[in-house]
């Protein structure tokens, strides 16, 4: 069986392949005057000079006809690819494939593939939901699933847990993602949101699990153990997509912050944290310390 990190790596590679397959069709879509106008307004003027999202005012300019046209075309394109892209993950681990199967618009692909900052993604999701209910929970599902996958990848590096515990940890991660959604929608500062999620996850980290150890083909069940881990977020560092497309500047920032993580109180999108440019292919990972 492949490790979760292998599957995560394969997922990003397949998503990159999906993007390459979509590019010719995206070019055709954006050649349409209505679509081109939508993309131009949404991405070129989404942020003001202070980094504040201006989707609310911009999206009011775009009528329901445009929204429906986009949704219908993107639904057709993405349904063709969704099953193949996630077949390997679906077959190996009990991930929440419902979120992946909701890939019904190009923006959702960008959300899971190039997610840079959870706070920004959730703010975008809230504003899109307000104006285009036809897209409903897509971005929310992407953020929640992504948060769960990140928590799983951390566990897989540190511990030799079995798949059933992966599933428990993913469930906790998805629940934490939903809680983070509420924190961000209440405009809670990112530091407080992180503290809130940390406290929430501390409760989830008390786990009673039957450890199964495989030795020379024999299955041995150990005694039930109680494990309590209390952590707090101390800092963060930038992580980029490993597919050869990340720019040199982002790679340099990633290397620098890997060696010297940034204190959480210095979190500043565009300065110390992604996005560093409009199509930034980075996100952040938290550094946790045991209390």
For the regions a language model picked out, list residue spans one by one.
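N-terminal leader/targeting and assembly helices and adjacent pre-domain segments
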Residues: 1-204, 220, 288-291
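Acidic, glycine-rich two-metal-ion catalytic cores of nucleic acid-processing enzymes
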Residues: 198-291
């Amino acid at each position: 069986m492949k490790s979760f990190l292998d599957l995560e790596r394969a997922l990003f590679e397949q998503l990159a392949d999906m993007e390459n397959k979509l590019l010719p069709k995206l070019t055709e879509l954006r050649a349409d005057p209505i679509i081109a106008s939508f993309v131009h307004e949404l991405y070129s003027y989404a942020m003001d000079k202070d980094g504040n999202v201006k989707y609310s005012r911009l999206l009011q300019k775009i009528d329901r006809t445009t929204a429906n046209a986009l949704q219908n075309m993107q639904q057709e394109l993405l349904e063709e690819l969704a099953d193949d892209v996630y077949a390997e993950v679906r077959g190996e681990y009990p991930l929440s494939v419902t979120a992946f199967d909701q890939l019904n618009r190009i923006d959702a692909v960008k959300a899971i593939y190039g997610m840079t900052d959870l706070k920004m993604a959730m703010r975008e999701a809230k504003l899109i939901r307000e104006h285009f209910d036809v897209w409903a929970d897509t971005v929310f599902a992407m953020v929640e699933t992504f948060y769960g996958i990140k928590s799983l990848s951390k566990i897989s590096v540190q511990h030799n847990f079995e798949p059933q515990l992966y599933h428990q940890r993913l469930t906790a991660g998805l629940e934490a993602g939903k809680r983070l959604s509420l924190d961000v929608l209440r405009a809670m500062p990112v530091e407080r949101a992180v503290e809130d999620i940390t406290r929430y996850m501390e409760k989830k980290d008390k786990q009673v699990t039957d450890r199964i150890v495989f030795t020379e083909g024999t299955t041995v069940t150990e005694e039930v153990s109680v494990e309590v881990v209390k952590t707090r977020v101390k800092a963060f560092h930038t992580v980029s997509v490993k597919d050869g497309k990340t720019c040199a500047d982002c790679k340099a920032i990633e290397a620098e912050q890997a060696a010297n993580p940034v204190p959480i109180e210095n979190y500043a999108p565009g300065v110390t944290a992604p996005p560093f440019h409009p199509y930034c292919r980075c996100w952040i990972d938290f550094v946790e310390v045991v209390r």
